[in-house]
């Protein structure tokens, strides 16, 4: 519907006043927004990148990754850092849990010499560091490990047993309001790792909840629920874990999709295992019983042998080009 001439003049004057007061680009028509094409960073998992819809985690947004202990939360974020560094991006790791293992990070492909790392004393300090790094415009990816370890200053200075009801939630709520806009302006990806707690007295429904209040749930553009679903064994020795990630919230594509992959201890996400599974799904690799074949040639009996074949052959490059990746 056409707008009459007087309204168009009034609108143009208002837009001009807003841009004069708040700067160019402070208001625009949605179709003119250059940020409509979302830039992403790979998670290090092909199947998870596909499940996310946009091809990875969106830049300029807040992402929450949560799950039980030893489910692969930190491993997944380290894989994101490795992928970002390969693209020449600058990354920072806020280690509130004081538990980051540089040797393990290096095994996953992280360039530890160029990874910024901070071990803050309080939750407020951690979030202020996040804000300072974001406002610098020079850091592309920031990881906070974890929300549960962001302890308010008042709680640290108090005594054990003192009540500090809602302190962490208020701290996170204030931080989210401050960080969200700065992250968008700087095009910085901020990933929070979070832990799971159980609600007391829940008779029906899911008793699980995450720490830090509700603010992070609202401000996060993507929320990933990561779970360990089984063990990978080499004989009697456990060498890794079967992992399932559910996209429980997604503001940049369709939510509620799932990805399954293997995490191998000391190696990270088993990319070759994903290539085998996705190759079978897209009918690039044939599976008959325990045997896997490519173009009529057998490449291995069992998934482990097929993975070894991919590691040793250039077939990996060809398989990466299947439709959907």
Swiss-Prot record:
One Pfam assignment: RecA_C
Gene Ontology CC terms: cytosol
GO biological process: one example: DNA recombination
GO molecular function: ATP binding; ATP hydrolysis activity; ATP-dependent DNA damage sensor activity; damaged DNA binding; single-stranded DNA binding
Alphabetized Gene3D superfamilies for the sequence: P-loop containing nucleotide triphosphate hydrolases (3.40.50.300)
Source domain of life: Bacteria
Binding residue positions for ATP: 67-74
Protein localization: Cytoplasm
Record's keyword annotation contains Mitochondrion: no
Keyword list, A-Z: ATP-binding, Cytoplasm, DNA damage, DNA recombination, DNA repair, DNA-binding, Nucleotide-binding, SOS response
Keyword DNA damage: yes
First and last residue of the signal peptide: none
UniProt function note: Can catalyze the hydrolysis of ATP in the presence of single-stranded DNA, the ATP-dependent uptake of single-stranded DNA by duplex DNA, and the ATP-dependent hybridization of homologous single-stranded DNAs. It interacts with LexA causing its activation and leading to its autocatalytic cleavage.
Name of the molecule in the record: Protein RecA
């Amino acid at each position: 519907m056409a707008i009459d001439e007087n309204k168009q003049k009034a609108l143009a004057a208002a837009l001009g006043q807003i841009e004069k007061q708040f700067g160019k680009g402070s208001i625009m028509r949605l179709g003119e927004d250059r940020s409509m094409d979302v830039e992403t960073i790979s998670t290090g998992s092909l199947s998870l990148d596909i499940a996310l819809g946009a091809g990875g985690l969106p830049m300029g947004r807040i992402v929450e990754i949560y799950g039980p202990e030893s489910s692969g939360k930190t491993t997944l974020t380290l894989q994101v850092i490795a992928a970002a560094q390969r693209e020449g991006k600058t990354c920072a790791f806020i280690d509130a849990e004081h538990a980051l293992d540089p040797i393990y990070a290096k095994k996953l492909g992280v360039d530890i010499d160029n990874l910024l790392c901070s071990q803050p004393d309080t939750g407020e300090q951690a979030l202020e560091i996040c804000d300072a790094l974001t406002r610098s415009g020079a850091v592309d990816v920031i990881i906070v490990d974890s929300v549960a370890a962001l302890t308010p200053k008042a709680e640290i200075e108090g005594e054990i047993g003192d009540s500090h009801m809602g302190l962490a939630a208020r701290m996170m709520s204030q931080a989210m309001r401050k960080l969200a806009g700065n992250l968008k302006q700087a095009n910085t990806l901020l990933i929070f790792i979070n832990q799971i707690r159980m609600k007391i007295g829940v008779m029906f429904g899911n008793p699980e909840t995450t720490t830090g209040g509700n603010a992070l749930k609202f401000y996060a553009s993507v929320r990933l629920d990561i779970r360990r679903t089984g063990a990978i064994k080499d004989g009697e020795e456990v060498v890794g874990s079967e992992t399932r990630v559910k996209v429980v919230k997604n503001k940049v594509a369709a939510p509620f999709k799932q990805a399954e992959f293997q995490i191998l201890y000391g190696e990270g996400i088993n990319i070759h295992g994903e290539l085998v599974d996705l190759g079978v799904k897209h009918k690039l690799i044939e599976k008959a019983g325990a045997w896997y074949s490519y173009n009529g040639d057998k490449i291995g009996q069992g998934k482990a042998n097929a993975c070894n074949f991919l590691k040793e052959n250039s077939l990996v490059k060809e398989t990466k080009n299947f439709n959907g990746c």
